[in-house]
Design a protein with these regions (language model features):
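Boundary at the C-terminal end of the N-terminal hydrophobic targeting segment
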Residues: 20-22
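Substrate-recognition/specificity elements adjacent to catalytic centers across diverse enzyme folds
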Residues: 24-228, 239-241, 245-254, 259, ...
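A glycine- and small-aliphatic-rich helix-loop capping segment at beta-alpha/alpha-beta transitions
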Residues: 234-236
């Protein structure tokens, strides 16, 4: 099974290599990061770096070349500045990010919770974004630069809010779209199960179930084409062991869904019930007091 999967992956990579264009771009910044970026006929970047952090540097540069808009909007979002651009709709997310004080959390735990290896990759990625800004000195997103490694880490933390549904619940509260006690009590979980089956798919098919004896991985994560979690396709490899192709999010230095010569991996998204909202009864005589039962 593993052998056949390897053959399938190697075959896929071989086909991809045959479609690469002859032109290569080698990028090097002042801090010593260096990567080679080669585009195939579909425009997908194939990125090589001697070290893992060099490959991450190249990934960031290529991604910024193709989709700086979504990367820039993510940085605005991560820094709790969405309200400045989106008004009230963005202010809900800003409030939550500031209330949870992610900056202090990351500052306190950056070195203790992340290995040196991971930090180097993140720092290489941030350097790649900043180098793109340096090369494209007339771009219209200058205000988000420089991007720091902690900005990248903050993106991972905040994405948990998106996938858990917390951010959308806070936004719903701020917009005043709350349900009355009568509405809540009259709703049956069994009658509303259709609300809880929205999600995405990842299916592995073993060789005994395929007509050619291959192992296949089918991934449909139902991600949007725009925004903070829009997929971007790339192939990244390094002399330290990286060799992976698949999709990543704007501002992320790793492949989230994809394959290498040994394995394939996917990611799914659903709508789990992870948030509880409590409506307080405010003292009409003093808005700073609420009923404690």
């Amino acid at each position: 099974m593993l052998k056949k999967f390897r053959l399938f992956v190697f075959f896929s990579i071989a086909i991809s290599n045959n479609t690469l264009l002859a032109e290569e771009s080698i990028i090097t910044d002042s801090s010593g990061f260096q990567a080679t970026i080669t585009r195939d006929k579909w425009g997908v970047p194939h990125i090589y770096g001697e070290r893992d952090e060099d490959a991450a540097f190249g990934l960031a540069f290529a991604h910024a070349n193709d989709d700086i808009k979504n990367i820039a909007e993510n940085m605005v979002f991560y820094r709790a500045q969405s309200g400045l651009k989106r008004g009230f709709q963005g202010a809900a997310a800003d409030y939550l990010i500031k209330a949870l004080d992610f900056d202090s959390l990351i500052k306190k735990n950056y070195e203790s919770d992340l290995s040196l290896e991971v930090r180097k990759v993140i720092e290489g990625y941030a350097a790649g974004l900043n180098y793109w800004n340096e090369v494209n000195d007339k771009n219209k997103y200058k205000s988000i630069f420089p991007v720091s490694p902690k900005d990248i880490v903050k993106g991972f933390v905040i994405q948990n809010l998106l996938f858990s549904g917390v951010a959308s619940e806070i936004q719903r509260l701020q917009e005043g779209r709350t349900k009355s006690n009568q509405e809540i009590s009259s709703q049956s979980y069994l009658l509303n199960q259709h609300q809880n089956i929205l999600g995405s798919n990842a299916i592995a098919v073993g060789p005994n179930k395929t007509n050619d004896g291959s192992t296949r991985l089918i991934i449909n994560s139902h991600q949007p084409l725009e925004g903070p979690v829009a997929w971007y396709e790339a192939h990244i490899r390094s002399d330290e062991g990286w060799n992976m192709m698949g999709g990543t999010f704007p501002g992320a230095p790793f492949i989230f869904v994809g394959f290498n010569e040994n394995i394939g991996w996917g990611m799914t998204v659903n709508k789990p019930d992870l948030t509880d909202i409590y409506q307080l009864e405010i003292n009409p005589q003093n808005k700073d007091q609420y009923l404690l039962d």
